[in-house]
C-alpha cells in the first residue's frame, strides 16, 4: 500500500423508511486531506446486519487518474469506478464497475472502456447513470459476518496498462476470493477520488424495511 494510513471508523446505521417508495441513500465520505490522493490499494471491513432484498452497499467509489491520458487527450472526462456487495431477489452478489472515458481524437468523439481480464467471459456493459463495463455475479457472503473488501491497482508487465482487481475475504473463515480484475487501458494510472461509501435501496418494491450495516478499518 502506498500510504499505511489506518482510519478507525465504525458506523452502524439502522434505517426504516415507510413513506418514501425509495429508501434514501446513506453516504460516507472519508477525510483524505492528509494523504497524497495517489493510491495503489484500498481496504475496508464490512458487515451486513439487516440485509433485505434489493440493497446495494458501495464499499468504494473511486476515480482512475487520467493525468497521463490527458497528456494526449486533454479534454478526456470520466473514469469513475465502484465496487461493493449487493442483495438481489433472494440472492447475494458482488459488483465491480468502470465508467467509460470520453475524449476526442482528430475532432471525433471516442470512448475508452475497461476490459475484464478475470474471470474470462464476454464483456458486460451497463447504462442508466452513465455507461461502462462491469461484472456482477452471485457471491454468497453471509449476513452478520465481517468481510474485508480490497482494491489493488498495478502495472501489467505484458501490456504496460494499469490493472485493478477486487478481492473479498471472509474474516471468520479467513478465505480469500479474487472476484474480478480489469484492464483499464490506461497507462501510469492509479486509484484516486473520494473513496466514498453508500447504502442504497434500488428497488421501490422493497422499501419500508430495515437495513443496517457496519464498516471499519479503512486502509490506504
Q: What are the functions of these language-model segments?
A:
Residues 207-220:
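Exposed low-complexity, polar/acidic, P/S/T/G-rich flexible segments that act as propeptides
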Residues 46-50, 100, 153-155, 170, ...:
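Short beta-strand segments enriched in hydrophobic/aromatic residues
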Residues 8-16:
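Bacterial N-terminal signal peptides
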Residues 124-148:
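Short, aromatic/His-centered strand-loop micro-motif at the edge of beta-sheets
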Residues 1-4:
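Positively charged n-region of N-terminal signal peptides that target proteins for export
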Residues 22-121:
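Secretory/extracellular carbohydrate-interaction modules
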Residues 141-178:
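Carbohydrate-binding surfaces in secreted/extracellular proteins
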Amino acid at each position: 500500500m502506498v500510504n499505511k494510513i489506518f482510519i478507525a471508523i465504525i458506523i452502524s446505521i439502522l434505517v426504516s423508511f415507510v413513506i418514501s417508495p425509495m429508501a434514501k441513500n446513506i453516504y460516507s465520505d472519508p477525510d483524505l486531506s492528509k494523504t497524497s490522493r495517489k493510491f495503489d490499494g484500498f481496504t475496508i471491513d464490512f458487515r451486513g446486519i439487516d440485509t433485505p432484498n434489493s440493497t446495494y452497499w458501495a464499499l468504494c467509489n473511486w476515480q482512475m487518474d487520467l493525468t497521463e491520458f490527458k497528456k494526449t487527450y486533454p479534454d478526456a472526462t470520466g473514469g469513475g469506478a465502484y465496487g461493493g456487495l449487493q442483495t438481489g431477489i433472494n440472492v447475494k452478489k458482488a459488483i465491480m464497475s468502470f465508467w467509460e472515458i470520453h475524449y476526442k481524437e482528430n475532432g471525433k468523439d471516442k470512448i475508452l472502456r475497461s476490459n475484464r481480464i478475470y474471470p474470462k467471459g464476454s464483456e458486460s456493459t451497463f447504462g442508466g447513470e452513465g455507461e461502462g463495463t462491469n461484472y456482477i455475479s452471485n457471491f454468497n457472503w453471509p449476513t452478520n459476518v465481517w468481510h474485508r473488501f480490497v482494491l489493488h491497482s498495478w502495472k501489467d508487465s505484458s501490456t504496460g496498462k494499469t490493472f485493478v482487481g477486487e478481492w473479498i475475504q471472509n474474516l471468520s473463515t479467513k478465505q480469500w476470493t479474487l472476484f474480478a480484475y480489469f484492464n483499464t487501458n490506461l497507462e501510469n494510472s492509479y486509484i484516486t477520488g473520494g473513496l466514498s461509501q453508500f447504502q442504497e435501496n434500488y428497488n421501490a418494491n422493497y422499501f419500508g424495511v430495515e437495513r443496517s450495516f457496519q464498516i471499519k478499518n479503512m486502509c490506504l
